[in-house]
Amino acid sequence: MPAASPTRAGQAAETQALEYLQGQGLQLLARNWRCKGGELDLVMLDADTVVFVEVRYRLHAGFGGALDSIDGRKQKRLVLAASLFLQKEPHWGNHPCRFDVVALQGSHHAGRPLQWLKNAFEC
């Protein structure tokens, strides 16, 4: 059986992350929200808090693991995209916000534990 494309593997990781977070009580507001500033993988609501979730999947840790792949440049792009989301969806603007990261690593990640970092970085 051929290996899954990186795009498919990333989509599968996002689906796994979404299902996990929904199981933890979060509600989906948007998925793959795109703007000129970038893309938000998942935008969710945790009680009254708008949560911008970056899902990272890495097959190997050779160039750093999934969590290591979120550098300062990526954080700035996420903050910009989140700001644009809140401008386009002003009814969420008065809610507290946070940035979370869900990381999955390894082949056939379905069923493998994932790492959920709440408040992964400050903006």
UniProtKB/Swiss-Prot annotation:
Family: Belongs to the UPF0102 family.
Naturally occurring in which organism (per UniProt): Pseudomonas putida (strain GB-1)
Gene3D superfamilies reported for this sequence: 3.40.1350.10
Record NCBIfam families: PRK12497.1-3 (NF009150), YraN family protein (TIGR00252)
GO molecular function, one term: nucleic acid binding
Short name of one Pfam family: UPF0102
SUPFAM superfamilies named in the record: Restriction endonuclease-like (SSF52980)
InterPro entries: Restrct_endonuc-II-like, tRNA_endonuc-like_dom_sf, UPF0102_YraN-like
Name of the molecule in the record: UPF0102 protein PputGB1_4524
Organism superkingdom: Bacteria
Phylogenetic placement of the source organism: Bacteria, Pseudomonadati, Pseudomonadota, Gammaproteobacteria, Pseudomonadales
